[in-house]
Amino acid sequence: MRARDVTVASVRARIVVQVSKRRLTFFRRGRRVLTTTVAVGSSATPTPTGSYYVNQRLIPSDSGGPFGPGAIGISAYSNVLTGWTQGGPIAIHGTNEPWSIGRAVSNGCIRVRNPVLRKLFASTPAGTPVVILR
């Protein structure tokens, strides 16, 4: 690979998820823009901790389905759900179960309220860092 074939871009946003507090914070240019309560993985299917990045976006055909209006795929994979592709990709997504927000009930994904998902979807390009803390 030649240097002239590569474009380097900086990302000015980041997401930090605190699993134990069930909280997601979105930062832009080092400033906190949004803090919200989230649903996280259950004890049987925990949300994996570590440093990841946004790698895809999904807009389902049915915005009333389990992902709500969309999903932000991140580079994390479940260590428990081995039956899914490559161990179960993890995402930040909306929900059709708003009662679940604030609980440890997901299969490892991070659920947010649908209006929050829309804001994040518009503000987190591919490569955005996502740090998931215990």
Named regions from a protein language model:
Residues 15-19:
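An acidic-aromatic substrate-binding cleft motif
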Residues 1:
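Short, surface-exposed polybasic-aromatic patches that bind anionic ligands, especially phosphate groups
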Residues 24:
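Gly/Thr-rich phosphate-binding beta-strand-loop-beta motif of the actin/hexokinase/Hsp70
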Residues 30-32:
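Residue-level signal for glycine
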Residues 4-14, 34, 42-51, 58-134:
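Exported/periplasmic cell-wall-interacting domains
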